[in-house]
Amino acid sequence: MAAKFHLKKAKDGQFHFNLHAANGEIILTSELYKAKDSALGGIESVRKNSQRDGAFEVKPANNGKFHFVLKATNGQVVGQSQLYASQANAEAGVQSVKRATPEAGLSDES
């Protein structure tokens, strides 16, 4: 199974997507979008920006764990990760996203 973006509609009518790795694990979650077209644009932004140097920022969380965010060229966050036990694990997550996004499919579940 290849990596895939899953586009969903929330109960409040907004849209969001998750990037699932080939093993089915969620490796990136989007922000909420008011329109489906905006969410689809967000997916394209993730595809583009995930390949850009300096687009990812690994950060410590308040509980001592780590996560990363993916930013567009305008500085807006277009995706974030789950929490990882260590900075090294979060950095490995970044590499997973970089590898997965160029060929990831799309499952429209909205």
UniProtKB/Swiss-Prot annotation:
Start and end residues of each stretch annotated as Disordered: 91-110
Superkingdom classification of source: Bacteria
Keywords: Repeat
Keyword Repeat in record: yes
Ranges occupied by Sequence repeats: 10-58, 61-109
InterPro entries: DUF1508, UPF0339_domain, YegP-like_sf
Family assignment from sequence similarity: Belongs to the UPF0339 family. Duplicated subfamily.
Stored PANTHER family: PTHR40606, UPF0339 PROTEIN YEGP
Name this polypeptide is given: UPF0339 protein PA0329
